Amino acid sequence: MQFRASIAAAAGLFALANARIYGIAFPETVKAGDEVEAVITTENYIQAVQDIAIAFGIATEASAYPETLGNALGSFYLGPEESNTLENITETVTIPAGLAPGQYVVAAGLYSLYGASSSPTLSHYNVTVTVGNVTSETYVGSQR
């Protein structure tokens, strides 16, 4: 009987788990015109976070300015279904067909509400990728 109570208590603690998004990952090399999986990476966190939406963009290294997206690749509603989860989130984006081979920056902007008072934040992430002849299966992640 005491064992069941312990399991019930542990299950209650797991239900209270909090997590946040801390970055993105993208194929190291992408082919223009391909659909690719953008990975939104998550981790344990001390308080609840409501992730509202994320948008992805791509720009040449020369035109990539801090906290900008460049040409939009897509935006996605996250909401309660994809907030406070320890499982990475995957969204599909299409690389523009007309991109010339070379180095590009893929950026993301994330809108979230933090804590009991729902403090709004806008977080920015980016990774450098190569546009080439094939989309790789190796992913590169944003730095913290």
Swiss-Prot record:
GO cellular component entries: extracellular region; host cell cytoplasm
Lineage: Eukaryota, Fungi, Dikarya, Ascomycota, Pezizomycotina
Signal peptide bounds: 1-19
Localization (cell): Secreted; Host cytoplasm
Keywords assigned: Glycoprotein, Host cytoplasm, Secreted, Signal, Virulence
Function: Secreted effector that induces necrotic lesions in Nicotiana benthamiana. Interacts with the host receptor-like kinases (RLKs) BAK1/SERK3 and BKK1/SERK4, inhibits their kinase activity and suppresses INF1-induced pathogen-associated molecular pattern (PAMP)-triggered immunity (PTI) in N.benthamiana. Also interacts with the host receptor-like cytoplasmic kinase (RLCK) BIK1 and inhibits its kinase activity, thereby inhibiting PAMP-induced ROS generation. In PTI, phosphorylation relaying by RLKs and RLCKs is critical for the initiation of downstream signaling.
Residue span of region BAK1/SERK3-binding: 103-132
Predominant location: secreted
One Pfam short name: Nis1
Name this protein carries in UniProt: Necrosis-inducing secreted protein 1
Coiled coil: none
Family: Belongs to the NIS1 effector family.
Source species of the chain: Colletotrichum higginsianum (strain IMI 349063) (Crucifer anthracnose fungus)
Family matches, as InterPro entries: Nis1
Domain notes: The C-terminal region from residues 103 to 132 is important for BAK1/SERK3-binding and the host cell death suppression.
Chain's gene name: NIS1
Sites carrying sugar chains: N88, N126, N133
